[in-house]
Amino acid sequence: LGAGEGSTPYLADFFDHLNIPLSDLIKNCDATIKNGIKFTNWNNDGEFYYHGFSTTDKSLGFDAVYDRYLSNSPLMAASIALNDSVKKIDFMEKISEANKVPFTLEANKRDFGFVSKKDPIDDYKKIGNISIHFNATKLANRLKEIGKERGIKVVDGTIKNVSLDKDNYVNGLTLENDEKIVCDFVFDCSGFHRLIIGKVYDAKWKSYKDFLPVDSAVPFFVEMTDKIPSYTEAIAMKYGWMWKIPLQNRFGCGYVYDSSLISEEEAVKEIEEFLGYEPTYPRKDKGGFKFSAGCYEEPWINNCVALGLAANFVEPLEATSIWVSIVGLTQIFENPLWLFKNSKDIRQEFNKNIVSMNNSISEFIYFHYMTLRNDTEFWNKFSYENAPKDLQEKINKWKVRLPSKSDSGEHWTSNSWTFVGSAHDTINKDVAKAYIENSADYKKGADMYDYYKKYQDYKVSECVDHRQFLEGLK
């Protein structure tokens, strides 16, 4: 479904919905906690910023003075207006920098040494949204085990042929051992092979290559440090960026780059120069994989739905691939199964929604690249003029106001745009000042700014160390 080992809070929520405990994933899949993403050196200045997940405890400030009718967090507006770093008022960033997770021990349980009998997670109070990092191979195997335990039949084999009925619906799969599997509905999860959606149905591909040029990645592993980070790190490189994902026993890393500017050999050389040593590569030839940013315009055709890499892939910067898959599954199963045979309107709605989601993701990814750096041909590609039209319109609006809910749609919050935009000065300090000077709600945020900074620091001290949290749930 995805190319990496990270995800968004949708995955953690989805596992919770499926009654797969977080402790199970920590025990069996080398899982760690993800509070958000740390973007390092994207302005070529050695600095960093975060796109953190939201808090769930309103006392922490972002929501305490931010109700449904306000377009953006007054505390974020205050930090920009004061020329202060957003990181000083972002609780999830603070706990990430302290190698902590947004969980506190319940007072009575801490005082009396209470140990829950049901699940160790019950000993903690969650005060922020999280996702997980995971060993992809171990997670796939664990989900297969759980599926078998719950009655799912697993057939191991390689598909040799896909047969269609007179209406062009998939009615059977033939394996290499000539075993035949009768089908009434099919999910194409064949990854970049796109076995059915691409090779059988020849669906139309919508490419983002014109404005998202990265198309290759070289994965590698490095050793874990004493402290386990509670975030994914995205480190800007000369011709792309490097992901660094902490598992319990190692970091999973990779260099995502533009192959029109450097070769695979040059990418490997840049990796080793950056690290100062040769890391462990999954492949002996130090090779990687290629991909094309885009999505199918019709991921659902007849009785086949493509999910994950088979349907779309933008790039792994915001760990969106599994997120899109979960949203797709959720939309499919909102409909009664007996409608699937004659479901043209349902299919059209699904396809429209998934393409719209991928378009939104591609815009948000491009926005990350609109940095202040211009040291290589790669970074010079990401100008306002080359941006998607809808993104240009958003940026034009942000010259006179802060990002709002109407900009965000259902996929990104206005805070998400502000986190990224404030890092490379797309969000204007004078605009934020105008909000505070002319709005009582935003002035309230500014007046309470110092209080919330101090209160958040206090709450950070109450949160649990990441490694201790993982050990406690094993």
Give each language-model segment a name.
Residues 74, 80, 154, 286, ...:
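Conserved beta-strand scaffold positions in the cores of enzyme catalytic domains, especially
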Residues 112-124:
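Residues forming anionic-ligand binding surfaces in small-molecule and nucleic-acid pockets
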Residues 6-10, 200-204, 322-323:
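Short secondary-structure boundary/capping segments
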Residues 334-474:
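Long, low-complexity C-terminal extensions of enzymes
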Residues 122-270, 329:
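Predominantly flavin-linked oxidoreductase catalytic cores and closely associated redox partners
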Residues 248, 258-368:
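FAD/FMN-dependent oxidoreductases across multiple families
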Residues 1-5:
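Glycine-rich FAD pyrophosphate-binding loop
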Residues 6-106:
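Dinucleotide-binding Rossmann-like beta1-alpha1 core, especially the glycine-rich loop
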